Amino acid sequence: TGFLGYNVLPRLNKIYEVTKCGITLDDDIKANLAKEVPFLLVHYDVVLHACGKAHMVPKTEAEKQAFFDVNYQGTVNLCAALEKVGVPKALIFISTVAVYGCEFGNLVTEEHPLEGNTPYARSKIMAEEYLTEWCRNNNVKLGILRPSLLAGKHALGNLGAMVNGIKKGFYMNIA
């Protein structure tokens, strides 16, 4: 579980029986979705798919490919595992506002074209397209969330860099 899971899991655990799949020590099912189909033991009613690679600007082809390995192939591998134990009733996918490809505060709707062209955006678009088809074919309700910025304890990316900069005194106070 990454940043989102770290902040959401305590709340989910109070209401639901939660199983975590990932590569950290505290995950219930240890699997690198980018490289393998996880071995699931039970059927799940609802799946929250928040696995993803973000927070870096790729400098090499291998770094670009890593976005597709995690965000797209990881999604394909998760779905393959779910098929083995019975598909869920619903799947919630955490995507990103980057799929829209907007550089400025343009108003977007759900019908806005997906024009993101970074490896991160393209890999998330591919995952969304795969899930849309997979869920349609398997009669699974799909919800796609496209957050713009996630804030909270242990923030990563630009927000985390800004918080760390403030702690080190790199930003002046505005009063």
Indicate residue ranges for each PLM-predicted region.
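N-terminal Rossmann NAD(P)H-binding glycine-rich loop of SDR-like oxidoreductase domains
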Residues: 1-14
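Adenosine-cofactor binding site in Rossmann-like domains, unifying the SAM/SAH pocket
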Residues: 19-38
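NAD(P)H-binding glycine-rich loop region in Rossmannoid oxidoreductase-like domains
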Residues: 33-70, 84, 99
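Glycine-rich NAD(P)-binding loop of the Rossmann-fold in SDR/ketoreductase-type enzymes
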Residues: 66-74, 114, 118, 122-123
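Conserved Rossmann-fold NAD(P)-dependent oxidoreductase catalytic core, especially the SDR/UDP-sugar
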Residues: 76-119, 135
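Active-site Tyr-X1-5-Lys
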Residues: 117-143
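NAD(P)-dependent short-chain dehydrogenase/reductase
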Residues: 135-175
